[in-house]
Amino acid sequence: MHLFVDISSHGFGHLAITAPVLNALVEIAPNLRLTVRTRLPQAMLAQRLRFPFELIEASSDFGYVMIDATHIDRPASAAAYRQAHANWPARVEKEARFLAELKPDLVLTNVSYLPLAGAALAGLPSLSLSSLNWADLFAHFFAHEAWAA
């Protein structure tokens, strides 16, 4: 079985949540082939992931544009979301083609939604693992904005 895992590079928490799950999966399914896409440092991945994996150094989300570790740059984040969704159907089609070429049996994200949309278009099963998600955070900060409808 081939598992494609997309881990948000927005901090280290997404890896901290995902790594124990992946390590446990590999223990019960040692022949599991894993492809991981993230921009997190390879050294950090090697500390947390106790199995061989193919690394795709890329990011499918940005989370939020941050001023510092605890403050969101709301105007910059709003602009980034508008840009990310300006041509959403084309982005989803590109992601679906990427996933179809990669041929995973399952797509797992923590917690980018682009791979979920691409997997749906490509007819691949997918799921997300997280203690939070961008949709709820987005609604908290931007639901009142006309452009966010």
Stretches found by the model and what they are:
Residues A19, A119-A122, H140:
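Short amphipathic alpha-helical segments
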Residues P125-A149:
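Active-site-proximal region of nucleotide-activated glycan assembly enzymes
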Residues I72-L106:
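Conserved nucleotide-sugar donor-binding subdomain of glycosyltransferases
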Residues F4-D6, L108, L129:
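Structural motif
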Residues L32-A86:
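Conserved nucleotide-sugar phosphate-binding/catalytic loop shared by glycosyltransferases and other
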Residues P30, L102, A122-L124:
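Helix C-cap/helix->beta junction micro-motif
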Residues M1-F51:
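N-terminal subdomain of nucleotide-sugar transferases
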Residues M44, V107-L121:
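An aromatic- and histidine-rich active-site surface loop
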